[in-house]
Amino acid sequence: MLMMAALPRAASAQDDGVKGGFVLSSAMRAIQIRQRVSPNLAHQLGSAADAGLARELHPRAVVHTQGLLPHEQDRDASVLSQEDWRQTLVQALAWCVTGNPAYEAKAVAYIDAWVAGYSPSFNPIDEADLVDLLLGFDFVQERLSPSTIDKTRQLGRQMATGSLGTRRVGDPSTGLNNWQSHRIKLATAGAYLSGDPALVAAAREGFLAHVSGNIGTEGRTYDFNQRDAMHYVVYDLEPLMMAASIAAAHGDDWYGMASSQGGLAAALRWLKPYAAGDKQHEEFVHSTVRFDARRAAAHVEGYSGLWQREEASNLYWIASRLDPQFIPMASALNAQPVVRALFA
């Protein structure tokens, strides 16, 4: 099932994974990315990295945005901190592609600042993009101090054990919806970085159980039934595809295992007519979650009106690297430069 040209099953890469060497991109894979990224895409990455070079760092002990409208409590400050995680990947990937030492230095600064004292809250919505910090770590780890490397791997272990634990933030439905998808993504990234086979096995078990419980035989997700929104179909599936991609980078075919019983491939096919623009959907009309109504009333963009199919761009680009049936759909959309490069 896997199209492994994009995610090679090199023996050396898998060996590194056992030792906790990387999350998604091994040293061999980094070379491959440099070779595959076009000059135009490299320019786009460089421009994105340049725009972030002057940013101040915003490490915090607590990051919290879940359930808050813009400007409520300290949400705005937490949004700045979450951008640190995303910028780590932008800067590290731009350095991988261009060799500009300023990008490397910025990525290293982010990692040093965050792993020095951050302890995960295990709220998978607040920390959904924390995985970007670890994806950036892949590219610059040889430039980090031994202490920072050790702290980053310890953070990965914390993410895995906490996300897979029995004590979980959120109401019971979060064990079935996108919250669990993000837990699985965070756990998978942390488990492979830790190099602990038991954690990897637990993450795989959680992944397969969640795919089975979240996606119906016809491909409809629990999130669509709960939220009546394509936005949440994408937000549910994208972290699962990232988890499957991380596993694939280590030679483990989670996507094929799940898709053999319908699973992810069925969900992607269910969404495809909407992503292609052949069908339209009015978002959140029958959502059972009260916060969705609050966001719509506050005119938060994307929480009312017709779904915009561009939201699925990154999802189908990632999917196309694991399953060739989705290449045409990925090509028809326009994934973000970071995603196109990361999965070049």
Can you say where each PLM-predicted feature lies in the sequence?
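Short, well-ordered alpha-helical packing segments
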Residues: 92, 134, 188, 241-244
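Long, repeat-rich segments with strong aromatic
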Residues: 194, 198-282
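Loop-centered beta-sheet repeat module
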Residues: 173, 177-190, 197
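Hydrophobic/aromatic side-chain positions at a characteristic register within alpha-helices
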Residues: 96-99, 191-195
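Hydrophobic anchor position in alpha-helical repeat solenoids
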Residues: 87, 100, 187, 240-243
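N-terminal export signals
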Residues: 1-13
